Amino acid sequence: MPASMFSIDNILAARPRCKDSVLLPPSAPVVFPSLHGDSLYGAASDYGGFYSRAVAPGSALPAVGRSRLGYNNYYYGQLHVATSPVGPSCCGAVPPLGAQQCSCVPPAGYEGAGSVLMSPVPHQMLPYMNVGTLSRTELQLLNQLHCRRKRRHRTIFTDEQLEALENLFQETKYPDVGTREQLARKVHLREEKVEVWFKNRRAKWRRQKRSSSEESENAQKWNKASKTSPEKRQEDGKSDLDSDS
């Protein structure tokens, strides 16, 4: 056996590239989630920038299956292959690993050999957009929107609503459900919003009350310290003179 076969280049070249991405040949259709029986299709060539070539260009992918719901209520387009497995070379020759998967397999949305994890698209957006005609930049934008942290919607109250809420808060700190519903109809808000506002307002009121009590205690201590009798001051001065003599 020649010694060149044990060189570093040959050893590294023989190893399977586990970081290779799953491919889509140009002739294969891209299946997106079904919407009440209607499927959205797009050409695989539109997504050439997302997937590398791992099979021969002339090979076909038969038996296109259905998509499924991924994690966090996001749809993932899946391309299921019934014949030869398509995927990274390090995973094609091994049986399903169950809970222990190869590091090249995406943790979510990947259903074994032959599945293609497409760009995540929020399911509520799919009825209003033709996913098959999106460009690479638009798909990247969808990925960024998916990765962003979902921000909690914050209600902005008008001056009239705040005035009505404050007036009721001055009357009672804990209004019942009927009172909250009556106020909600008056200021055109939902009763849940009024309830949340009162919870936050009570928390703010307690903080203000606690801070004001601490300030009053500190003021009383300061007043007691400043109102020391002149006799006590003179006695302190005499004791200082005696100690010096």
Swiss-Prot record:
Chain spans, region Disordered: 203-245
PROSITE patterns tied to this protein: HOMEOBOX_1, HOMEOBOX_2
DNA-binding region: 150-209
Biased composition (Polar residues): 219-228
Intracellular or extracellular location(s): Nucleus
Chief site of localization: nucleus
GO biological process: regulation of transcription by RNA polymerase II
Entry annotated with the keyword Coiled coil: no
Basic and acidic residues bias (residue ranges): 229-245
Entry's Gene Ontology molecular function annotations: DNA-binding transcription factor activity, RNA polymerase II-specific; RNA polymerase II cis-regulatory region sequence-specific DNA binding
UniProt keywords, alphabetically: Developmental protein, DNA-binding, Homeobox, Nucleus
GO CC annotation terms, alphabetical: nucleus
Pfam families registered for this protein in UniProt: Homeodomain
Biological role: Involved in the development of the organizer region in the gastrula (Hensen node in chicken).
Name of the protein described by the UniProt record: Homeobox protein goosecoid
